[in-house]
């Protein structure tokens, strides 16, 4: 093990994806990084577990039993605790390509992107239309609405914020997305799947935000571009699950001189004049344990290391389910995302279903892993909140559901304390909100915008 330096530019606590992207990018940019995790594995709350570890985590069995044994080899299972897909033209994909982390991972397309209309047994599950031709074929709309949707999608494709001739007479600096929808005469159900299954908004707040239309149009366009990249769906997902994503960035950091320490507890944060200047820590799992102290210009980390500096902003509910069949209504897709917009089932928050299978090497052949997620809206009976999603799954072989998971956000921006804290992973089934957080932390910590495009050039220059 290499010697601990007396001082680093950055100390990072926790090996979740947000933290690993930041340590990788900062290392590439020439910063001296020490990256620590109290666990013996990478990933933090977003790790991937085998089936036995999942049973043990949730306590779904009695002492002396081994319920996982009937599901084949343990090593064939890689189950994500936080289910998320990557948009093929999204920010995380751009960061992966720009940093060349793609060389450590293999991605495969997610077979379908679906949305539910209505509720209960009679609900319609259909592919989210991503272009004008699909809009005309979609069972989600009547014949006249299909034409309105077709003209809306075509307009999104030609829209240019800098060219008022493409603005349909709307003042984009002040108009709302409701004004845009009304311009095309779109029905409520159509607005629902555009806003929630294409633009991927979590609630309907975006509709009435003055000046918010350009952002919504960008998000709809990102969806369309991501579908166009590979066809079928806008999502991709790594073979063997998401657990390898943080490790890919950890490798990147290590190549550029980053130091990684697992099994290491933080005993104390050191302050001078109210600003964090270092840590006291103990590395366990070795004889004898190694106690050390080191300093840093700034400290980044996940909320679990800073309980006095974060607040709870909500709770996420997740049920991890093992199935022996694909989801109904998805044309037997081996993997898919299904979004149930909140208004369809009388809720304030959407319900997300992410389904993967042996096609992505996360379980043995013949099995499917479906994870249902939403934001808690009540204080009890949380399984009832997930019920509209669980109903879509058919017969469930095993179901793992713990108590509501708190969502944390930092209380302050970190500029005065020198501590920059990430947000918890939300209920969305994609990484766009995570990369927003990465960029936000980078901006707060360095005072600069994170420019993804030039990262590979920096690396090449550093390799010479």
Swiss-Prot record:
One of its GO terms (biological process) is protein transport. The keyword Amino-acid biosynthesis does not apply. GO terms for cellular component: cytoplasm. InterPro entries: FAD/NAD-bd_sf, GDP_dissociation_inhibitor, RabGDI. Keywords: GTPase activation. It comes from the Eukaryota. Pfam families: GDI. GO terms for molecular function: GTPase activator activity; Rab GDP-dissociation inhibitor activity. Interacts with the GDP-bound form of Rab GTPase YPT7. Belongs to the Rab GDI family. PANTHER family: RAB GDP DISSOCIATION INHIBITOR, RAB GDP-DISSOCIATION INHIBITOR. Regulates the GDP/GTP exchange reaction of YPT7 by inhibiting the dissociation of GDP from it, and the subsequent binding of GTP to YTP7. This is Rab GDP-dissociation inhibitor.
